């Protein structure tokens, strides 16, 4: 049974429209022949994600998302840590709405769980194209000016 959980550590939990997010994630997963199992999002600050990056991945830098893959066969399971600080600073640097960048990061982790990579230039280009397809799907569902966040 599909279950998507949202938690926060050191930040306020974004007011996620859970039903819409769940439907969107399920649609994206189904495009890759996958079903949603159990997914947990932990929204955090930069310091929390830096510590996790150091402890679990031996990386000494900030990042927007860390994805821990627990997938089984064709079922998507995983834990995703998202730094809202980095999402916000990336949105400013890219001149994007915060909500749009958060949507991209939310689905970026799901795409990793569906098997996409982003370590090489070719893989990164494929990831960006998949993100854009997923974001188009979202915009078609909720409208381009709307957000997955309650305002």
From Swiss-Prot:
<dbReference type="InterPro" id="IPR023091">
    <property type="entry name" value="MetalPrtase_cat_dom_sf_prd"/>
</dbReference>
<keyword id="KW-0698">rRNA processing</keyword>
<keyword id="KW-0690">Ribosome biogenesis</keyword>
<keyword id="KW-0479">Metal-binding</keyword>
<comment type="similarity">
    <text>Belongs to the endoribonuclease YbeY family.</text>
</comment>
<dbReference type="GO" id="GO:0005737">
    <property type="term" value="C:cytoplasm"/>
</dbReference>
<protein>
    <recommendedName>
        <fullName>Endoribonuclease YbeY</fullName>
        <ecNumber>3.1.-.-</ecNumber>
    </recommendedName>
</protein>
<dbReference type="GO" id="GO:0004222">
    <property type="term" value="F:metalloendopeptidase activity"/>
</dbReference>
<feature type="binding site">
    <location>
        <position position="118"/>
    </location>
    <ligand>
        <name>Zn(2+)</name>
    </ligand>
</feature>
<dbReference type="GO" id="GO:0004521">
    <property type="term" value="F:RNA endonuclease activity"/>
</dbReference>
<dbReference type="GO" id="GO:0008270">
    <property type="term" value="F:zinc ion binding"/>
</dbReference>
<feature type="binding site">
    <location>
        <position position="112"/>
    </location>
    <ligand>
        <name>Zn(2+)</name>
    </ligand>
</feature>
<keyword id="KW-0963">Cytoplasm</keyword>
<keyword id="KW-0862">Zinc</keyword>
<dbReference type="GO" id="GO:0006364">
    <property type="term" value="P:rRNA processing"/>
</dbReference>
<dbReference type="InterPro" id="IPR002036">
    <property type="entry name" value="YbeY"/>
</dbReference>
<dbReference type="Pfam" id="PF02130">
    <property type="entry name" value="YbeY"/>
</dbReference>
<keyword id="KW-0378">Hydrolase</keyword>
<keyword id="KW-0540">Nuclease</keyword>
<keyword id="KW-0255">Endonuclease</keyword>
<comment type="function">
    <text>Single strand-specific metallo-endoribonuclease involved in late-stage 70S ribosome quality control and in maturation of the 3' terminus of the 16S rRNA.</text>
</comment>
<feature type="binding site">
    <location>
        <position position="108"/>
    </location>
    <ligand>
        <name>Zn(2+)</name>
    </ligand>
</feature>
């Amino acid at each position: 049974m599909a279950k998507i959980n949202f938690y926060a550590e050191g930040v306020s939990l974004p007011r996620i429209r859970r039903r819409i997010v769940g439907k969107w994630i399920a649609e994206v997963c189904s495009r890759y022949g996958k079903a949603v199992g159990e997914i947990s999002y932990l929204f955090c600050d930069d310091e929390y994600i830096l510590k996790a990056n150091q402890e679990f991945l031996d990386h000494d830098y900030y990042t927007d998302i860390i994805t821990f893959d627990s997938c089984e066969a064709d079922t998507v399971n995983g834990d995703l840590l998202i730094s809202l600080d980095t999402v916000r600073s990336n949105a400013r640097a890219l001149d994007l709405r915060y909500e749009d960048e958060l949507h991209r990061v939310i689905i970026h982790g799901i795409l990793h769980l569906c098997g996409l990579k982003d370590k090489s230039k070719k893989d990164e280009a494929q990831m960006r194209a998949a993100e854009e397809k997923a974001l188009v799907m979202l915009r078609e569902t909720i409208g381009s000016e709307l957000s997955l966040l309650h305002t």
